[in-house]
């Protein structure tokens, strides 16, 4: 089991990053909510990881905080929820927000995420209720805008932001509309993604 990787951030192509650990490159899929916490290319990066072995592939999922990985693993225990959906959930809300959603039986918010239908959302509420009952939501770290990284330069940040939304399961028209709705001069890729996701959940 690979539980943690520490190395240099070699590539950043949401939702995937490439971590160079002593000359070995590890491709890791991360929730889009983690983008703002990643360092600049070439700088040191540490990720808590979850290793998945399938017949056709070996996959690594990375998380900035231990509690993100903890919730990811709890989500995988829910019937019908695989790694892709678990990453999508963590891309849209923090562990604290998800816990509040389950405790408040907020079915509507769950169904606003791509790939989460009513039946899946109902299973999440039912099966996760007992699993998160001891989750100390108030004591865990919460993401804040001040922690977000500086904007990534270059003309392709719009395309990269749109590609990240497509990877979550949104349709091209939805992704393009959401990006254009929040885009402003000087805005970086990570902020674009964060605001677009926030807007899509509110308006969907």
Swiss-Prot record:
Pfam entry (one): RuvA_N
Molecular function terms from GO: ATP binding; four-way junction DNA binding; four-way junction helicase activity
Region of interest (Domain I), residue spans: 1-64
Species whose genome carries this gene: Hahella chejuensis (strain KCTC 2396)
Name under which the protein is recorded: Holliday junction branch migration complex subunit RuvA
InterPro entries listed in its UniProt record: DNA_helicase_Holl-junc_RuvA_I, Hlx-hairpin-Hlx_DNA-bd_motif, NA-bd_OB-fold, RuvA, RuvA_2-like, RuvA_C, RuvA_C_sf
Compartment(s) of residence: Cytoplasm
Family membership: Belongs to the RuvA family.
């Amino acid at each position: 089991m690979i539980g943690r990787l520490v190395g240099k951030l070699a590539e950043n192509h949401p939702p995937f990053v490439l971590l160079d650990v002593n000359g070995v490159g590890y491709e890791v899929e991360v929730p889009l909510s983690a983008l703002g916490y990643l360092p600049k290319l070439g700088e040191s990066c540490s990720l808590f990881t979850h290793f998945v072995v399938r017949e056709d592939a070996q996959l690594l999922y990375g998380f900035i905080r231990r509690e993100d990985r903890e919730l990811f693993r709890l989500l995988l225990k829910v019937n019908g929820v695989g790694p892709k959906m678990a990453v999508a959930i963590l891309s849209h809300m923090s562990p604290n927000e998800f816990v509040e959603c389950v405790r408040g039986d907020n079915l509507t918010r769950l169904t606003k995420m791509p790939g989460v239908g009513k039946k899946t959302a109902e299973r999440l509420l039912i099966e996760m209720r007992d699993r998160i009952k001891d989750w100390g939501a108030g004591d865990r770290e919460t993401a804040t805008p001040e922690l977000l990284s500086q904007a990534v330069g270059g003309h392709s940040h719009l395309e990269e932001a749109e590609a990240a939304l497509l990877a979550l399961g949104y349709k091209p028209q939805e992704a393009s509309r959401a990006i254009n709705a929040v885009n402003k001069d000087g805005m970086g890729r990570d902020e674009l993604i964060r605001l677009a996701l926030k807007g899509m959940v509110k308006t969907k």
